[in-house]
């Protein structure tokens, strides 16, 4: 009797401008690669828009495509990973937003994107990062992913 349990492995490229997720489904002795982008299979923009009065959050492609519309009512944050270099924080709708919290919203967007396409909750992933990303920035990414319910297994 062979083991036919379906197993998944996920990888995330957490980029400054865009993010992408890939999944590998393993069943029996074969793998199937599944790319998770937006509806057109494009990478997800690393942007977050936070409503200045209500605190509602828009992320990814929606935030990117609605940036003009959202610019008046939202604090628009792009290139999320570049915030890791700065002592950055913003008080928006009564909540103190840090780079870690903003990055967590991007991870949630990626996780939701996978779930909408497969009904699978991405709970673990390997995350691709630039070679020079120091330990403090990796810690921000690890904490942000954990806030989104994703355990980073390793960085590559």
Predicted regions and their residues:
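Gly/Thr-rich phosphate-binding beta-strand-loop-beta motif of the actin/hexokinase/Hsp70
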Residues: 2-33
